[in-house]
Amino acid sequence: MNPRIFQWALAIAMSCGLLPLQALAQKVQVQWLGQSAFKIISPTGKVIITDPWLKANPLTPPEFKILENLGKVDVLLVTHGHLDHFADAPAIAKLNNVPMYAPGDMNATVVALGILPPALAPRFNKSGTVQPQPGIQVTAVHAEHSSVINWKNPSTQQDEIHVGGEPVGFIIELENGFKIYHMGDTGLFGDMKFIADYYKPDLVLMPIGGNFTMGPQEAAYAATELLKTPNVIAMHYGANPLAKGTLAQFVGFMKNPQIKIHPLKPGEVASF
């Protein structure tokens, strides 16, 4: 939705007594919870959780290792099946009775294994768009990565590896038209430029740790040469010793002063 249309619609709703004053003034809040997990609060107060690896994540603030402390979750998004993105998602889905939106083949496996019922594991895929809440749209886009589901079979107590589908990133469009591109885990690919040209994200959540994803230099190239988005928050670094990339290295490679890097520590919030 165009931001001006959103403001006009909110003004009418307020004049009719349908929305409180704070709904118009509220900003987009983006809180980093470590790795690729974020708590995003939309302009009307809807809570979006992405890639929730919280309980075992060494970077997650202690309060959020208790899933109930996330509050009411309205939208739950998972980019792929690796445990550092998926681990706590089923529990959050059940706790809030909220669907877990994830790649279609991944959720087919989730249902087949009995991890979640079909109602909490809807299927969609790259280029597909869903509307999990009124005024909020989520589109799945390409990510250059892999995806499997590691699952402990309750009958045998053996660890098993199952199909995780194609990994994705998400374009999250909020009620006021603000667009967030959560890249998921990804390496460089040329269609990042297409994603930027077509969807025009206002904020990119970008992996920088390397080894499993882009490292600092590749991420800086993606930000400055392909995406050219006005705002970037770095993610997917610091939690795994194999992902050695640092925020300082990423900042050092960034050469475009028009792109603002928001240097969040786990638990900190950026407002837009």
Model feature map: region roles:
Residues 1-10:
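Bacterial N-terminal signal peptides that target proteins for export
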Residues 56-57, 83-87, 107-110, 128-130, ...:
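Active-site environment of divalent metal-dependent phosphoester hydrolases
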Residues 9-20:
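Bacterial N-terminal signal peptides
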Residues 157-225:
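Active-site-proximal loop/helix segments of hydrolase catalytic cores
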Residues 24-26:
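Boundary of Sec targeting at the N-terminus
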Residues 43-83, 87-94, 117, 147-162, ...:
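Pre-active-site segment of Zn-dependent metallo-hydrolases
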Residues 100, 114-132, 220-272:
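Binuclear metal-ion centers of metallo-dependent hydrolases, dominated by the metallo-beta-lactamase
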Residues 49-51, 73-81, 101-104, 180-184, ...:
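Active-site neighborhood of phospho(di)ester-bond hydrolases with catalytic His/Asp-centered motifs
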